[in-house]
């Protein structure tokens, strides 16, 4: 099953509101947000032995990369919005 089939309803809803590219970016951003929450939750239960209260380095790196990807996607959405607004 493709990503388009798995997320058909969300894609349809967002593409209707934001256009095809904006809708797809919005759904990608939602998926990254969900992944960020899941990895963050995992980090709560898997603590760093050397730094109590902090997630292990691999989880911290994944969290940082997902947050960076979200920021880039958000910037593309904002650029697209500013180009469409006169």
Regions found by a protein language model. Give the residues of each.
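Long, low-complexity or tandemly repetitive, helically biased scaffold regions used
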Residues: 2-86
